Amino acid sequence: MPSQVMDQRHHMSQYSHPTLAASSFSEELRLPTERQVGFWKQESLPHHMGSKSVASSPIEKPQPIGTRMAGRLELLQPYKLRDQGAAFSLEHKLFGQERHANLPPSPWRPDQETGRQTDSSLKSAALFSDGRINPNGAYNENGLFSSSVSDIFDKKLRLTSKNGLVGQSIEKVDLNHVDDEPFELTEEIEAQIIGNLLPDDDDLLSGVVDEVGYPTNANNRDDADDDIFYTGGGMELETDENKKLQEFNGSANDGIGLLNGVLNGEHLYREQPSRTLFVRNINSNVEDSELKLLFEHFGDIRALYTACKHRGFVMISYYDIRSALNAKMELQNKALRRRKLDIHYSIPKDNPSEKDINQGTIVLFNVDLSLTNDDLHKIFGDYGEIKEIRDTPQKGHHKIIEFYDVRAAEAALRALNRNDIAGKKIKLETSRLGAARRLSQHMSSELCQEEFGVCKLGSPSTSSPPIASFGSTNLATITSTGHENGSIQGMHSGLQTSISQFRETSFPGLSSTIPQSLSTPIGISSGATHSNQAALGEISQSLGRMNGHMNYSFQGMSALHPHSLPEVHNGVNNGVPYNLNSMAQVVNGTNSRTAEAVDNRHLHKVGSGNLNGHSFDRAEGALGFSRSGSSSVRGHQLMWNNSSNFHHHPNSPVLWPSPGSFVNNVPSRSPAQMHGVPRAPSSHMIDNVLPMHHLHVGSAPAINPSLWDRRHGYAGELTEAPNFHPGSVGSMGFPGSPQLHSMELNNIYPQTGGNCMDPTVSPAQIGGPSPQQRGSMFHGRNPMVPLPSFDSPGERMRSRRNDSNGNQSDNKKQYELDVDRIVRGDDSRTTLMIKNIPNKYTSKMLLAAIDENHKGTYDFIYLPIDFKNKCNVGYAFINMTNPQHIIPFYQTFNGKKWEKFNSEKVASLAYARIQGKSALIAHFQNSSLMNEDKRCRPILFHSDGPNAGDQEPFPMGTNIRARSGRSRASSGEESHQDISITSVNCDTSTNGVDTTGPAKD
């Protein structure tokens, strides 16, 4: 019977077209849930029905509908007469394990392999379709894998005689050998055979995509290597970072390259050595001297920051980077006061102080090509040990010299700058830290943000130069050859092509609107660093050459990048206009169109991604900046919190390199219509400086009134932005920008001819910056750069208040009480403000608390009352008869809790703005407070004489003001002048800030 069955099946196969056999593999890799259990009808195998023959193999076993072993049914699929295209082939077993060798040897002999190779190749050709039935047997390669799987099987699955069962076709089996060794007829053996025939899913998939060897060796490999995505899927997981760098070229297929590459979410660069150590897990009881002694053992300490020691960390900065390396190596995990130190390198922020800018690296310009690195090493080595001398890519006349010690770099800079070496006058400049490292870190985030109007707030990129890369730029070309400074090599090649690909991919149809001379929308900027700019100089020439063309004609506000200043190209600022046509005329320098262009809202594109491709040196003389300054910007006029690097050169003429209609040829349009500043003599251009300190949304910088009293403005302004907060001057908007207030600049201060000042800025804050604080030029008619509004009106108001408080930090200090100064006699003020008084305290309660120890030491006291709720407003004023009385009074109350009402408030003392008894009387005697209940008035006491300490009536003025109609705290009805007494410190958190709210006065 077995021979009859097999013969019948053999005849069946002879009627089958080879393509039908091949198509039976089309669903070979379907998920296990798609195995169509119970699909087969019994009439598919008519010769099995009623058969009582001895089943010597699982193939001869009849299966009812709904059987629980799907694997048995799958073995029958190659012999199904109907639906040949959807059959599940016995060739499924090609992916089995070596356990197939456990099969009984007699039905399957090595000599039965005749003709197998051809048949196997035909069937494997259609093994992977696309998951669809292919009755014609046509080969389809758009399936689960895009690689040529047929080639894998043709080349890899050459089976030997050891794979008899899985290597040969059933129709080729010679059943003459069946009776040689009878087979046991038990369900257990049958199940074992079937189990051996069926590979599990892991074995199945691993045999397909390994491309390593025969599938019978799959169980000898590690499971981690069987990952389907390892080689077949193109998603390398857990691979080495260096390998990623080498294989990265061309791996990005989305047109943006590094945006979705290994830079996103991965630590491309490990911790880079730095001269500054960030030491965590510090015991707060450790003395500063102890820390200094510990770390000074490894070298001279440049700075020791211990203000956050109570929070568990300190920062130590060395002059020599080797000192930091040794300290980290020796002290890592060492115990200090029973705490193991956790030390990391700390890279200075992108807005470092002046001393942090020079990190031991200087850039050498105009080097004679005949000079070798050895020659330079001899010349510069006299000032200190040199760590490395690097060449600048594509700039043979530029060199980067890195010293171990920053003091050596400073000495070399001072001694050799502007000196002649090999017949050429060299130029030296400091280099900021980590140029190439920040290049790669910011590449993905800054690319689209800079050019296409996306500004992410609260990220590191908001204070860092924008860098970009496109397409298939090879990441391996961006290297970091030193511990702290990197160089950019070969980035220019292939970049333009990649950029055009990015433009076509990300913004279809946009290229037709871009002038041909505009090579790319890329933005590569630098914060006064030639280590970056020298390497990117050539890129700048091709990337940013505008040639009179404006940027993309995007309508609306330009992209804001905090900590950035606009760009100037041939005297005209590169920006995004509201009206591109009118602005194109402005770019051409047409004077008659200037006023129209300004009214069409030429918006300075602060921090835009444009590169004008010209060295800043070309305009240095015109802008009044000295070429001998400590830093300049090449190829890009962006200042990244580094405006202090420029030095004013008073002898330089203030001229633009091309006819600038904004500067010397201001049209006759009225200032109110221009929304700008009238024309001024060019000699005042540099001196009339507009500083911007701690700018917030809706705030304008502090202005020196003497500048405005001159009654002549200037077309371009210098602006320093050391703390340029996102959304600064966001309220200074224009019509057409829905996110901005439509407040006209000339309506704020009409006496200035259209100039703008923030009303919240008090005269006390007014002042001008030093020449070193003058940054890049804001070129345009509007003194304030219109920027997008990023926050709500509530946030804007809070920011304005915070801005006012922040700008008055110096004023706040003058109200602080310093006992030491009183003891020395340096401070003779006598009027104090007592803050954090419980609101339920009355004047009598307060007097009782004071008189316990200080009766007769004061002659004035006033506790303002809120007449609406009949409670005090939380503070009081007292005038001591002698400054020395303040010392015991301070010791009694300052920092102490109040006894009554179980209050948690802690009293604090500060000086009041109005000082002295007579000044206080003069302030209140004509106040509407005199119309209130006597219990709410200030209380006077005799200062001297026999009645010293006794209460005296408060003198009434002759011009007492009437009640204003709304409740106030001090009298309920005080005017602004009356309030000023309480406005010294009108709540418990501020000093010297005038506040006129009802609960504040």
From Swiss-Prot:
Residues covered by region (Disordered): 100-120, 767-815, 941-1001
Keywords: Repeat, RNA-binding
A Pfam family this chain is assigned to: RRM_2
Organism for this UniProt entry: Oryza sativa subsp. japonica (Rice)
GO biological process: one example: positive regulation of meiotic nuclear division
GO molecular function terms listed in the Swiss-Prot or TrEMBL record: RNA binding
Known function: Probable RNA-binding protein that may play a role in growth regulation.
Record protein name field: Protein MEI2-like 4
Signal peptide from the UniProt entry: none
Keyword tRNA processing appears in the UniProt entry: no
Residue span(s) of domain RRM: 275-348, 360-433
